[in-house]
């Protein structure tokens, strides 16, 4: 199999509109949790969100293009722009059919659905926007990124709910390994903080009942009550190693393992025995040709819901055995909230930065240990630790499990 490296990264998040801003916030433990501002949440079961502030699509694309995209697509294009620019990829020197795109969204545009339903009910079907469908469908994240940057290779959209970003990068990784592309622009995006999107998750009792910004997103903490809904995008440029070397690209990290499984258990809850997530982790580690004892850090899915954090802990212990007690486990969602389809991609970026700097970020807000979640969740500040591998997990509604193993790059 061909080696696959990361040569560019881009992020649009509630705590920073670039990888640098985002990473600085992560290191500082800076969050952006507050009551929803985009609509009145008085009658909702939940009130806290991690909204993106000060995003201007015209900073990343022309006005005409922005007008023909919904917010989730705009986030994707913005993150892709940063990633491609960092990679130094020059499409005038590439075979465009060897450069592909795999940027997914778990939901697409709830905004268009809400507006269209209102128009349909008040003005009739004749007044619906002719672009309604291409605006709302989730594959337009990948479609718009490919159009904006001239990517004519394999162009796919993975939709696996909260595992979308991780699966998107994993499938892009496989695509390059199998010689179906030399470069893939991959990641996830989401912008679903709307009355219906927020209300749906609240009705499911998935969102936190807390209104305390310091205690609303607290993965693995005994007092956790649900996740904080966030939004944003994460995109990476994946590249075949020799292709990257030939053009003098700076290599940020290397993908060395990908595991993907299904629970076949429940539409929202992970399997209680953790077997599906455990097998995904096991396969990712096995592909790299290393022992589970060689992995000392897991960036967990860690949503701050009771079921996820408990069953993911069980899965980690099932995979790593006694070694799990010695490992560091954290959750980036303690800082960003849950970015849904974008979460896994942003967490891959987090892993790359941690490997580069030898720093594992704290799980912000973690205070009260849960006797059932009994691992080291990095609750007392960042940890300086020179690690070689970072394993990141994503678990999506429907029983979708994905794990990626990222390695500190060595020639």
PLM ranges: what are they?
Residues 1-65, 242-254, 349-363, 407-411:
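ACP-dependent fatty acid/polyketide chain-elongation machinery
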Residues 180-225, 258-272, 302-309, 326-376:
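Acyl-CoA/ACP chain-elongation machinery
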Residues 83-95, 244-250, 281-297, 319-323:
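Phosphate/pyrophosphate-binding loops at sites that engage ATP/ADP/AMP, CoA/4′-phosphopantetheine
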Residues 76-89, 138-142, 146-149, 154-190, ...:
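Active-site-proximal alpha-helical scaffold in enzymes
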Residues 6, 27-160, 189-198, 292-308:
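Conserved beta-ketoacyl condensing-enzyme motif
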Residues 122-129, 167-170, 174, 190-246, ...:
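Glycine-/small-residue-rich "gating" segment that lines the acyl/pantetheine channel
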């Amino acid at each position: 199999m061909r080696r696959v490296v990361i040569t560019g990264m881009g992020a649009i998040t509630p705590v920073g509109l670039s990888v640098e801003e985002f990473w600085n916030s992560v290191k500082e433990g800076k969050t952006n949790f507050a009551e929803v501002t985009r609509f009145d949440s008085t009658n909702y079961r939940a009130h806290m969100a991690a909204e993106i502030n000060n995003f201007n699509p015209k900073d990343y694309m022309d006005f005409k293009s922005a007008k023909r995209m919904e917010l989730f697509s705009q986030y994707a294009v913005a993150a892709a722009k940063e990633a491609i620019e960092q990679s130094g990829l020059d499409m005038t020197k590439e075979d465009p059919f060897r450069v592909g795109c795999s940027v997914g969204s778990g939901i697409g545009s709830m905004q268009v659905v809400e507006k269209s339903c209102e128009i349909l009910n008040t003005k009739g079907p004749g007044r619906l926007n002719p672009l309604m469908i291409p605006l709302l469908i989730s594959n337009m994240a990948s479609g718009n990124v490919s159009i904006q940057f001239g990517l004519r290779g394999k162009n796919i959209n993975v939709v696996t709910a909260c595992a979308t970003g991780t699966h998107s990068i994993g499938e892009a990784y496989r695509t390059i390994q199998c010689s179906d592309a030399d470069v893939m622009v991959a990641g996830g995006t989401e912008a679903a903080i709307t009355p219906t999107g927020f209300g749906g998750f609240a009705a499911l009792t998935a969102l936190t009942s807390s209104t305390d910004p310091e205690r609303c997103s607290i993965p693995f903490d005994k007092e956790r009550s649900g996740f904080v809904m966030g939004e944003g995008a994460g995109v990476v440029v994946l590249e075949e190693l020799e292709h990257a070397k030939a053009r003098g690209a700076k290599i940020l990290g290397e993908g060395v393992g990908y595991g993907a499984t299904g629970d076949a258990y429940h539409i929202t809850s992970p399997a209680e025995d953790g077997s599906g997530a455990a097998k995904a982790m096991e396969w990712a580690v096995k592909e790299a040709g290393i022992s589970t004892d060689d992995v000392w850090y897991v960036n967990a899915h860690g949503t701050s819901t009771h079921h996820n954090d408990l069953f993911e802990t069980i899965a980690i212990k099932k995979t790593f055995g006694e070694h799990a007690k010695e490992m560091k486990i954290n959750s980036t969602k303690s800082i960003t909230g849950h970015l849904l389809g974008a979460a896994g991609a942003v967490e891959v970026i987090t892993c790359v930065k941690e490997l580069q700097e030898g720093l594992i970020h704290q799980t912000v807000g973690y205070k009260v240990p849960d006797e059932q979640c009994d691992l080291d969740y990095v609750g007392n500040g960042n940890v300086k630790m020179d690690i070689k591998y970072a394993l990141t997990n994503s678990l999506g509604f429907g029983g979708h499990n994905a794990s990626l193993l990222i390695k500190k790059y060595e020639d």
